[in-house]
Amino acid sequence: MLQTNDKLKKIKGDASFRSFYRKSSSKKKSIVVFASKEKEKNLLIYDAINSLLIKNKVLAPKLYSENYKKNYIEIEDFGDDSVFSLLKKNKNQKETLYKKSIDLLGVIQKIKQNRSKNFKGKTYKIPIYDNVKLFNEANLFCEWYAKKFVKKNKLTKFKIDIKKQIRFLLTLLQSKEKVLVHRDFHASNLMKYKNKIGVIDSQDALIGNRAYDLASLIDDVRFKTDKIFKNKIYRYYLKLNKKRVNKATLLSDFEILSILRNMKIIGIFTRLAMRDKKKQYLKLIPYAWKLIELRISNNKKFSELKSLLELNFSKKIRNQK
């Protein structure tokens, strides 16, 4: 619990409505998370998911104290060594860190429970990551990015056509198996702590397609990797899960979800800039386009989407930051 003499130092946050402070006066290292908006998700659900992860031998932040009325929780501090920051310092450890992250993903995807209690003792049932939600997320591309670049006289038709393509891709998803999906399983949310890889920022977790988190990691918009490396990490995941997955199904779902995720990301980053004045994410949009182009070129089933995007978004537009 926070005391009046506690010293708090604000630390860099993320794209959410939360703010983070490092508590320096405690014997234990801790982070205080404040969330006056979306309190239930950012405090109660975050704790419920972390509890589930910890129960299943996944390194996630422990809860130290909470004051829901005052909009905060105090959690374990994993330090500053995210996989992203470690990769920036030394790219030679790239393969090791990515493989350890895939190992962690394997543990998460073996979790069978879909319920967990939060610090108020209430059971939280993790929702399904269904096609409605996937559609609404990909549609952020249309609602925020497209309206910025597609000419007004063409926008209505473009919206109809792109929504049709998103729905078409969703009908092609094949995997019936459902696993715990973190939804932001990328280098910035994976932390090296106590010589292990742990995970943070898990409040948005849902039950869904195993290829989603794999696409989040391999096609991470924040850290560029070449096609050879991406294929190597993909094959490593396949080797670890060969008894659990159908090769063709996994690859098809992976490509589809990577495309839809990066469309979502372009939409979200545009919204952050336009609505919330957080323009620092715009610089990542050109690489999100590169990732879409990489996956879209792999299969004829994406040909209509490819043509539609090429017709409306020139290279000049795609490279704008």
Report residues per predicted region.
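An alpha-helical support segment within catalytic cores of ATP-dependent transferases
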Residues: 1-2, 113, 117-120, 124-125, ...
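A short beta-turn/loop motif at secondary-structure boundaries
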Residues: 11-15, 65-68, 257-258
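Active-site activation/catalytic loop segments of kinase-like enzymes and analogous catalytic loops
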Residues: 139-149, 210-244, 259-276, 288-295
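ATP/Mg2+ or Mg2+-diphosphate-binding catalytic cores
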Residues: 267-321
